[in-house]
């Protein structure tokens, strides 16, 4: 059975690859109720660093347990860690602008944490620096790898993604997903519409006002790499693809988005519609946690978390190398059993 669903085509996953996790924060995640990517709004600023640490070390150093939702559902970093362990992948962390820096080796592209997009997220100089340094990084990675899998960790990232998509003219209102089974659409809409009210007219001005550092860095790495890239994420990665398309239309043909079935099945969002507008194919891993012995993992089947830290893309890679959803679940449960 094929455990990878393809929508609008695909890219080849053959060859030597590296997994890149791009982390950042913005002050949007401090808005109460906008994200569940952390037990409290304040803890959301620790989530990207902790996700990065867990991906590399299988333990968190910046906080004393893995990032969880307010109801205790574990970070999708466990899916990425398990999948990439099965295929023995090279994993690199890029800090695009995280308020809390991870206590592991990472690549810094000279970014800053984003502010509240209702005021402004980044200065033009910071956006330009993130973009230029990320392009250089992509160019260097192209010397060693045939393709990249790029994941993200940024709380409230779907809100900044929606703001970017709308500011670039896409029909994306209410189409981005949420880590919660109850997508806080009214709150997101309110924040985003306030953010895009007085937009600068130029591209750099727009993304500096409403983007998060992660999206700009992912775009830069992909542009510099100039070869095949699997953007490992949900609706946020359609915004990264939209930024790429604005800068260099030709690069789009090298890109596919790799996500989870939980994003595709999410009735509160519409990744298929946005990806068609941008012109990128989507692939989804058909993982199944319904028979897991752990309630924290079974919750994924009920619409909690869904995606993040490259969970979809990394599991697509493991599935493409011949592992089954059951193999991946066994590895995830091994890791999860040490956490509880």
Swiss-Prot record:
Coiled coil: none annotated. This is UPF0284 protein Saci_0020. The lineage of its organism: Archaea, Thermoproteota, Thermoprotei, Sulfolobales, Sulfolobaceae. GO terms for molecular function: nicotinate-nucleotide-dimethylbenzimidazole phosphoribosyltransferase activity. HAMAP family: UPF0284 (MF_01086). Gene3D superfamilies: 3.40.50.10210. PANTHER family: PTHR38811, UPF0284 PROTEIN SLL1500. InterPro entries: Nict_dMeBzImd_PRibTrfase (IPR003200), Nict_dMeBzImd_PRibTrfase_arc (IPR002805), Nict_dMeBzImd_PRibTrfase_sf (IPR036087). Belongs to the UPF0284 family. It comes from Sulfolobus acidocaldarius (strain ATCC 33909 / DSM 639 / JCM 8929 / NBRC 15157 / NCIMB 11770).
């Amino acid at each position: 059975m094929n455990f990878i669903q393809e929508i609008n085509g695909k890219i080849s996953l053959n060859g030597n690859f590296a997994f890149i996790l791009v982390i950042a924060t913005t002050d949007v995640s401090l808005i109460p109720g906008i994200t569940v990517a952390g037990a409290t709004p304040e803890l959301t600023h620790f989530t990207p660093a902790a996700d990065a640490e867990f991906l590399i070390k299988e333990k968190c150093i910046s906080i004393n347990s893995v990032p969880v939702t307010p109801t205790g559902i574990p970070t999708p970093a466990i899916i990425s860690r398990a999948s990439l362990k099965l295929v023995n992948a090279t994993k690199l962390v890029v800090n695009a602008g995280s308020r809390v820096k991870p206590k592991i080796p990472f690549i810094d592209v000279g970014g800053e944490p984003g502010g509240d997009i209702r005021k402004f997220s980044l200065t033009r100089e910071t956006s330009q620096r993130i973009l230029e340094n990320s392009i250089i990084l992509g160019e260097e990675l192209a010397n060693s790898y045939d393709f990249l899998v790029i994941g993200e960790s940024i709380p409230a990232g779907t809100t900044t993604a929606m703001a970017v998509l709308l500011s670039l003219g896409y029909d994306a209102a209410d189409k981005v997903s949420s880590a919660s089974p109850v997508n806080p659409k009214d709150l997101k809409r309110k924040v985003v519409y306030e953010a895009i009210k007085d937009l600068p007219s130029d591209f750099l001005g727009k993304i500096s006002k409403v983007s998060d550092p992660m999206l700009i860095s992912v775009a830069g790495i992909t542009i510099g790499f100039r070869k095949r890239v699997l953007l490992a994420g949900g609706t946020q990665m359609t915004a990264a693809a939209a930024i790429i398309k604005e800068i260099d239309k030709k690069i789009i043909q090298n890109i596919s988005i790799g996500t989870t079935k939980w994003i595709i099945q999410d009735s509160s969002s519409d990744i298929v519609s946005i990806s068609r507008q941008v012109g990128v194919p989507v692939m989804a891993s058909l993982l199944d946690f319904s028979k897991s012995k752990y309630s924290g993992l079974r919750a994924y089947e009920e619409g909690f978390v869904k995606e993040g830290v490259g969970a979809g893309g990394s599991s697509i890679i493991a599935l493409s190398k011949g592992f089954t959803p059951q193999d991946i679940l066994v590895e995830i449960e091994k890791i999860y059993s040490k956490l509880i």
